[in-house]
Structure formats: C-alpha cells, structure tokens
C-alpha cells in the first residue's frame, strides 16, 4: 500500500516484483541489476516500449551540498509552485520538487542545479565504472541529470525504465547503501535492486 497521496494513474493498493543484491558495493553489481531488469522486460516483450534513464546521485555528502543548492534555487519561487509543491518546499523536501506535477514546476526542475555539479571524484569514478560495466552488455540508455531519488538512504546509481513518450515508470531501482543503518544495522551495508509495478507491466503487455 502507498502511504502518500496517490498521483495520477497510481493506485493506493498495488503489486510489485523485484530483485535485490545485499552486502555488495561493487559498481558492476549496479550494472548487472540494470541488465537483469532489461532482460525481464525483454522476455515479457515490452522492452522496446520502454526507455532506460540512468543517473548518479552521489554520496550522502554530495547530496547535502546539493540540497543546499536546491534550497537556494527554490527560495522565492513559491508562486510558481502548485499547492503540493509549496507544501514540499515548506517541509524542505527539495528533492521531491524535481518530480513536477505542473508545467511551471517542470520548467523549474529543468532549470534547477543538477546533482552532477556536486559529485566528489570518488562518486564520479563509481559512476564511470558502473557505465563501463553496463556498456559491455550493449543495451541502450540515456543519462538523465534530473533523475533523482528523494529517499535519503539512496546513493550513487539510480535508474528507471519508463514507458516511451510518457513519465509512467515501469521498473525503478538504484543503490541504497544507507538503508542498512537506517533500519538498525551497525555498519553501512551495500545494497542495490529494483522494483516493477505488476499492474503497469501487465497493462503495457496488453497494449
């Protein structure tokens, strides 16, 4: 069940399937997870109807610098935001503002600073190594600097398989090294995986 208010074309109750790799921090794992998602959608006969978007969101330290930049960017732009957007701004959910609900918010999201401007050398190297591994699989993708995960425990790689000519997400994933400590583990526990909406996948198969 979704806790937050469902957006357009989303449901409160839904089914999903996915895959996870826990305890590994090798960027090649991220590439393998993306390739697994690609293969599943290919075997279901819908990969050609999806486009793969990829980005890096860097380390926790990179994100903190980025959040400061977003706070400065959105300051004074309340009138261009929807009621929901203004609520996000008041709650300092700056990353959520990059998932726009209106045309004005979409324009602002495109103008906003990009996380790639704040990457440390280590984060950039991780992303480069991941892309090198992914390229060996020979699959098509687009690097999208606006692709961000609002959840604070995500880091480094993030990706989405979207329905072409649409913002509808079919399969979404990324790296979440910060999740282990958030739920009580003593140390940082590497993790990477994806989840796909069952209902959206079936609907696309029927088209």
Please provide the spans of the model-predicted regions:
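TRNA-recognition modules of translation machinery and tRNA-sensing kinases, especially anticodon-binding
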Residues: 1-207
